[in-house]
Amino acid sequence: GRMGHTLVEKISARSDCRIVAGVDQKAGQIGDIPVYASLEDLPEAKGIVIDFTSPAGTVHAAQFCAAHGMPCVLCSTGLSKEDEAVVEQASEKVPVFRSANMSVGINVLIELARRATKLFDGEFDIEIVEKHHHNKLDAPSGTALMIANAINEEAGGKYEYVYDRHVVRQKRGAQELGISSVRGGGIVGDHDVLFCGPEEVVTISHVAQSRGGFADGAVQAALFLDGCEPGYYTMTDMLKGKMQCL
């Protein structure tokens, strides 16, 4: 897929790691890199798996890696609670890095949104608007939910997420956190967090201009996992030192 080709481009330009093989429904070759139809077809179960497939593919990758002692970076969105439970079980046996968005910039946005939530202390209404290409299947995006969950955690869990305002004709409640989705064209990924007060609006924005940022983050995560003990790791763990300066 597109992320697979982007990963090949990014990793090929580095000297601290290399691609052993790829996995895709269509087996074949990308340059000198063999591509297999499934993880089970790999000649050797070694290295670190980076997964950008689908919820079903992510669950399978987590189970395969747990069974073969392979660390994994799982980047797909749209996972159910049952899917996430499988991922957490895998993390008991191998290092698992999980994030719905591998962009370092998005994770800085999340930290800034946390800080703003604390500073405004419930005095501002909060809305999240996410925009993606017309082929994206899940809505709202996994990233929008990551942002909402971080805000809600900072606020003590008081917010109720509202996704569809047209079904109810009533004024906005103080405990609502609205999440709106836009799908169109080739938008890679835009996220805006709006803190709306009576006299002013503060907007924190992130715009992904290409898929390269996601690939870079995934490679950094794989390098971070090298040598880690089994466990469930996130961007917060990887960026802990840098986040302290915010």
Show which residues each predicted segment covers:
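Short glycine-/small-residue-rich Rossmann-like dinucleotide-binding loops
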Residues: T53-S54, T77, S181-R183
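C-terminal substrate-binding/catalytic lobe of Rossmann-fold NAD(P)-dependent oxidoreductases
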Residues: R2-P43, G122-L246
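Hydrophobic beta-strand scaffold residues
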Residues: I19, V35, C72-V73, V96-R98
